Amino acid sequence: IARLQLLHFSTHHLLLMKPAIEMQKEYETFLFIADYHALTSVNDPNILKNLIRDAVLDFLACGINPENVCLYKQSDVPQVHELSWFLSVLAPMGLLERCHSYKDKIAKGLDSTHGLFSYPILMAADILSIEASIVPVGKDQKQHVEVTRDLAAKFNNIFGEVFRLPNPLINDRVSSIPGIDGQKMSKSYNNVIGIFESNEILDKKVKKIVTDSKNIEDKKDPDSCNIFSLFKLFSNTDEQKE
């Protein structure tokens, strides 16, 4: 759980938010606040409470309509955690040990805990409990959807056809958003652009975005222009051609 920035919601905010906004009128859409997942990195209950509130406000401010979307808090659905346990007794250790996200998070300084190690199992329960068919994720979360499919298939093989096998929806463009310094946008690099930052801060950050040495009037290469890469995230094809 974190305030919206151009990069992140768990992995990528745009990766979840844009598809959710676009799909909410055509599909049965479920969005949840992952407060149990957040416990792997947040221990202060007051901080967690504020993050939950902020995340809900972010969803609503960006265009999520509660009349079209089922928006809920993970901890309010006890069945998710029951299912997580049922899946855990079927999950081979080797399956979890192969998950690169655990190793990445440990390398970034998070404590090596069972909760962090078994994160993919709770994520599988999140997905399977609502019978999701499409799951918007980043490339770094694709493996977790594959774990979900493996666990669902194993459960179905033992107990019958209970769970639907979900498919990941991956936006390749969003997985590599450039930060204001030209590197991959990341809070650890301190190069993010917060959606709800003040105009003054946004103005300063935008002016710091790394560009080439060409004059404003010169023709730019859209594939290597950082400004255009950000513009593409919030524009349609016609606007990009213009």
Task: Give the predicted meaning of each segment.
Residues I1-A125:
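N-terminal Rossmann-like or analogous alpha/beta NTP/dinucleotide-binding catalytic cores
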